[in-house]
């Protein structure tokens, strides 16, 4: 899968850029108002009791700020944070080394926590619940179990696939927070703030236009802004104008709904080749040259959210809205 302008996952070169944009306190965090309000209470109560915050599960689509929120939680609790990825913890010993290095109250953030292996996950249960580890040393008749006490800590797990978590792991999180797609006005505020960080200016109309095409995702909004800024600077414009914004996005193949060329390819497959469906995911994958799992995890969720396709027992089916929208796009009469 090529890097797409509207891909909600992080591109390799974006990590340092995203770090420079991240707020450090809840009051600076834009959007997710319900989550912010709840976290303010949970954090204040934990600090009043002089206890670590309860374990937190953050879930929702990629690019909505799960890592940012975990850093904010650590900052608000005034503790250190350790950030790791689920797939990088290959053996129980790896997890034991990480947990035993934590200081009292520290935050351990595990991204893609749904990808932990079952043997690693089982070691995590007593660590989360009672703050100890049972490690088996040796093999066969010489094997023995050693208990290691751990300092109280907060585990923050992040996942885009909450349904893939096992029930025992999911139930050990005291706080469950689902991040939702952002509203246009929230994205506009983020875009204006990012433009300031980048040392450029953008008018309100252009910021709204970018927000409309950002798939409800701050990461996409910031990526589009960076590319539009390139066009602005090459054109030697004083600020990012609506004319530059629209022309740039057209060249980037991002339409007014935030759909890119791959989205159009997938919708054309369903609408034109299979007359609106239903059509199976495997068939779509072969038709557009992508893997089934990529379609299911990356492309399809936004098309469903926009109301263009629906899942049925027999496969994916285009909605009446999709027929209307794409017939207009292609200049066809309904």
Swiss-Prot record:
GO terms for biological process: DNA recombination; DNA repair. Its EC number is 3.6.4.-. Keywords: ATP-binding, Cytoplasm, DNA damage, DNA recombination, DNA repair, DNA-binding, Hydrolase, Nucleotide-binding. The keyword DNA repair applies. Mg(2+) binds at residue 67. Residues 183-253 are annotated as: Small ATPAse domain (RuvB-S). It is found in: Cytoplasm. Residues 1-182 are annotated as: Large ATPase domain (RuvB-L). It catalyses: ATP + H2O = ADP + phosphate + H(+). Pfam families: AAA_lid_4, RuvB_C, RuvB_N. The keyword ATP-binding applies. GO terms for cellular component: cytoplasm; Holliday junction resolvase complex. Transmembrane segments: none annotated. It comes from the Bacteria. Residues 256-334 are annotated as: Head domain (RuvB-H). It is an enzyme of class 3 (hydrolase). DNA binds at residues 292, 311, 316. ATP binds at residues 21-22, 63, 66-68, 129-131, 172, 182, 219. Has 3 domains, the large (RuvB-L) and small ATPase (RuvB-S) domains and the C-terminal head (RuvB-H) domain. The head domain binds DNA, while the ATPase domains jointly bind ATP, ADP or are empty depending on the state of the subunit in the translocation cycle. During a single DNA translocation step the structure of each domain remains the same, but their relative positions change. Homohexamer. Forms an RuvA(8)-RuvB(12)-Holliday junction (HJ) complex. HJ DNA is sandwiched between 2 RuvA tetramers; dsDNA enters through RuvA and exits via RuvB. An RuvB hexamer assembles on each DNA strand where it exits the tetramer. Each RuvB hexamer is contacted by two RuvA subunits (via domain III) on 2 adjacent RuvB subunits; this complex drives branch migration. In the full resolvosome a probable DNA-RuvA(4)-RuvB(12)-RuvC(2) complex forms which resolves the HJ. This is Holliday junction branch migration complex subunit RuvB. The lineage of its organism: Bacteria, Bacillati, Bacillota, Bacilli, Bacillales. The gene is ruvB.
């Amino acid at each position: 899968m090529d890097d797409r302008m509207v891909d909600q996952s992080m591109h390799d070169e974006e990590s340092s850029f995203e770090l420079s944009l991240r707020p450090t306190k809840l009051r600076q965090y834009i959007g997710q108002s319900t989550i912010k309000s709840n976290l303010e209470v949970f954090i204040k109560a934990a600090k009043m009791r002089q206890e670590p915050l309860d374990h937190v599960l953050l879930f929702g689509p990629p690019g909505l700020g799960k890592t940012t929120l975990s850093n904010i939680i650590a900052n608000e609790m005034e503790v250190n944070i350790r950030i790791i990825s689920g797939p990088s913890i290959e053996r129980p010993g790896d997890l034991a080394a990480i947990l035993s290095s934590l200081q009292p109250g520290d935050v351990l953030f595990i991204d893609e926590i749904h990808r932990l292996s079952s043997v690693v996950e089982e070691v995590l249960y007593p660590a989360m619940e009672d703050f100890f580890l049972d490690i088996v040393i040796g093999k066969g008749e010489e094997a023995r179990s050693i208990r290691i006490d751990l300092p109280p800590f907060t585990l923050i797990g992040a996942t885009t696939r909450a349904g893939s978590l096992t029930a025992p792991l999911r139930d050990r999180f005291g706080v469950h927070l689902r991040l939702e797609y952002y509203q246009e006005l929230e994205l506009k505020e983020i875009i204006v703030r990012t433009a300031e960080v980048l040392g450029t200016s953008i008018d309100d109309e252009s910021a709204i236009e970018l927000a409309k095409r950002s798939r409800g995702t701050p990461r996409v909004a910031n990526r589009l802004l960076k590319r539009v800024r390139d066009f602005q600077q090459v054109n030697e414009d004083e600020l990012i104008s609506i004319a530059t914004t629209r022309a740039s996005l057209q060249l980037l193949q991002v339409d007014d709904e935030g759909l890119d060329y791959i989205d159009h390819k997938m919708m054309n497959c369903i609408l034109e080749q299979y007359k609106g469906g239903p059509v199976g995911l495997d068939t779509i994958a072969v038709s557009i040259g992508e893997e089934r799992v990529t379609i299911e995890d990356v492309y399809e969720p936004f098309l469903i959210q926009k109301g263009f396709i629906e899942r049925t027992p027999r496969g994916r089916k285009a909605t009446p809205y999709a027929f209307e929208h794409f017939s207009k796009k292609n200049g066809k009469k309904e």
